């Protein structure tokens, strides 16, 4: 079950390059870290075991032992995991690079077999070609890969993934790329590779090869924000940042194919890159559509719509004594932008509701309350216009000059007053609002900090290391630089 891990252990002494590339955490004496109860394939050692979250991308793809190396498939250091990684589209040339990598690092020849025979300690099964002694020689060349789908990007990590497991909680899926290469040609490569093995080992090798090389591909899974670890999030000044660790090298390659070309023809460059690499920490902002959706869902869950019926003059998030409006603990870990949006939305709705509906106290039970929660939950979905229209109708609009309008005369604070003027592009606020104006104000408050349409879909920790370095040099890793302020603010 751990053929790839065993091969890395035994082949690490074959060459100087192998000594550098085949050191994986699963073969070390380190104590494993705690498990996250997620069972799957570690993409570094390929064994089926319990996984934990990677320091480099915050996804669960590394085992409790390999996590000690702090390696990620998004590093730019040419370690073994990086060498097995390719980004879509997958071509025959890229697949040939994987085959050449296996042949280079895990060769099978009479000399290699004799070397392993001499290395095996004298035991009963020494000359019986038992699998337990020679498992490292049973590593066939297959084109199976674990695939991470980051919306438009697909990243393939090739490896020998044995066994079967449910993939419910895994951020990746296993696919077979043999049809993109040549099935008969790959068969021939493996037949030649196993020809030197004893008969008993040949049958096991062939069984391993055909069992995995003919596996059907799984349907790819889109990576969502819920797949990422929250353990490496820090909260400074009520702004969330993510700590990311990446392995860096000063050497660069134009493409992964060029990297593999140097692996074959310029090993000294690879060794120099490995020996001069360093582990660097990045503090990236966590502003993305996935997190905004999660925060808004939580905001709607904790929302106390009774506030719009109340006479409170304090912001909605600062009500602590009223049992109908108290959200004391809801914003303890909430992003400050969510709190600002919540305060302005409920203050505006309070002013509209108190101006049009005869309601006296926040203890009142009103039919509009579920619509307030719906407005928050639908604030960044296509249903927002329908929800706003229902909310407008709940304000008892009256028809004036063939238009439905609502009154607006209840008190609001000066910051909200200024913001609404900016949204409507007017010098003074009217005492009535049409549906279009009501709609524009709510959307303007929701979008006051960021344009949801232009947010990244996933956190920055899914980007390649080179891009993180570039963003850091430009000073754009911090959230302040990534906030897409609404155009209306620039027009003020």
Curated annotation (Swiss-Prot):
GO biological process, one term: symbiont-mediated suppression of host cytoplasmic pattern recognition receptor signaling pathway via inhibition of IRF3 activity
Region (Important for cytoskeleton localization): 82-176
Chain intervals for the UniProt region annotation (Interaction with host IRF3): 318-492
Region Zinc-binding domain: start-end pairs: 42-79
GO cellular component, as recorded: host cell cytoplasm; host cytoskeleton
An MF annotation (GO) of this entry: metal ion binding
Principal subcellular localization: host cell
Superkingdom of the organism of origin: Viruses
Coiled coil: none
InterPro entries xrefs: Rotavirus_NSP1
Keyword Protein biosynthesis: no
Keyword annotations from UniProtKB, A to Z: Host cytoplasm, Host cytoskeleton, Host-virus interaction, Inhibition of host innate immune response by virus, Inhibition of host IRF3 by virus, Inhibition of host IRF7 by virus, Inhibition of host RLR pathway by virus, Interferon antiviral system evasion, Metal-binding, RNA-binding, Viral immunoevasion
UniProt region (RNA-binding), positions on chain: 1-81
Subcellular location: Host cytoplasm, Host cytoskeleton
Keyword rRNA-binding applies: no
Placement of sequence motif pLxIS motif: 483-486
Complexes and interactors: Interacts (via C-terminus) with host IRF3; this interaction leads to IRF3 degradation. Interacts with host IRF7; this interaction leads to IRF7 degradation. Interacts with host CUL1 and CUL3.
Family: Belongs to the rotavirus NSP1 family.
Task performed by this protein: Plays a role in the inhibition of host innate immunity by inducing the degradation of key host factors required to activate interferon production such as IRF3, IRF5 or IRF7. Associates with components of cullin RING ligases (CRLs) including CUL1 or CUL3, which are essential multisubunit ubiquitination complexes, to modulate their activities.
Domain remarks in the Swiss-Prot or TrEMBL record: The integrity of the zinc-binding domain in NSP1 is important for degradation of host IRF3.
Protein name, as recorded: Non-structural protein 1
């Amino acid at each position: 079950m751990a053929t790839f891990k065993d091969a890395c252990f035994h082949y690490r002494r074959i060459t100087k390059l192998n000594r550098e590339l085949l050191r994986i955490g699963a073969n070390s004496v380190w104590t494993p870290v705690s498990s996250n109860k997620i069972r799957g394939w570690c993409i570094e050692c390929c064994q089926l075991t319990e996984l934990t979250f990677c320091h480099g991308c915050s996804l669960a793809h590394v085992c409790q032992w390999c996590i000690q190396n702090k390696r990620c498939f998004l590093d730019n250091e040419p370690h073994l995991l990086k060498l097995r990684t390719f980004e879509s589209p997958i071509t025959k040339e890229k697949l040939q690079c994987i085959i050449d990598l296996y042949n280079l690092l895990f060769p099978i020849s009479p000399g290699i077999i004799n070397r392993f025979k001499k290395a095996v300690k004298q035991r009963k099964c020494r000359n019986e070609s038992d699998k337990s002694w020679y498992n490292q020689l049973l590593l066939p060349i297959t084109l199976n890969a674990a695939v991470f789908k980051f919306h438009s990007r697909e990243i393939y990590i090739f490896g020998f993934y044995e066994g079967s497991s449910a993939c419910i909680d895994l951020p990746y899926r296993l696919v077979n790329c043999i049809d993109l290469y040549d099935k008969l040609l790959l068969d021939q490569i493996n037949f030649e590779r196993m020809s030197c093995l004893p008969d008993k080992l040949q049958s096991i090798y062939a069984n391993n090869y055909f069992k995995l090389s003919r596996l059907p591909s799984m349907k790819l899974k889109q990576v969502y924000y819920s797949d990422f670890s929250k353990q490496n999030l820090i909260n400074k000044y009520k702004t969330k940042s993510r700590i990311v660790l990446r392995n860096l090298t000063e050497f660069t390659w134009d493409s992964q194919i060029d990297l593999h070309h140097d692996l074959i023809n310029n090993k000294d460059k690879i060794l120099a890159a490995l020996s001069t690499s360093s582990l660097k920490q990045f503090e990236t902002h966590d502003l993305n559509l996935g997190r905004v959706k999660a925060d808004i869902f939580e905001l709607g869950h904790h929302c106390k719509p009774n506030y719009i019926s109340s006479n409170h003059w304090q912001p909605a998030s600062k009500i602590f004594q009223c049992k109908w409006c108290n959200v004391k603990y809801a914003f303890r870990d909430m992003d400050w932008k969510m709190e600002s949006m919540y305060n302005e939305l409920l203050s505006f709705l309070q002013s509209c509701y108190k101006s049009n509906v005869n309601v006296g106290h926040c203890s009142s039970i009103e039919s509009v309350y579920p619509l307030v929660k719906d407005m928050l939950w639908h604030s960044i979905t296509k249903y927002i216009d329908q929800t706003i229209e229902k909310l407008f109708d709940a304000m008892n609009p009256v028809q004036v000059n063939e238009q439905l309008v609502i009154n607006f005369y209840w008190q609001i604070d000066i910051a909200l007053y200024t913001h609404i003027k900016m949204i409507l592009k007017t010098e003074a606020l009217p005492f009535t609002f049409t549906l279009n104006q009501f709609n524009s104000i709510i959307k303007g408050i929701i979008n006051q900090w960021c344009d949801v349409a232009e947010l990244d879909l996933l956190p920055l920790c899914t980007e390649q290391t080179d891009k993180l370095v570039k963003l850091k040099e430009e000073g754009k890793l911090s959230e302040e630089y990534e906030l897409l302020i609404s155009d209306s603010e620039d027009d003020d």
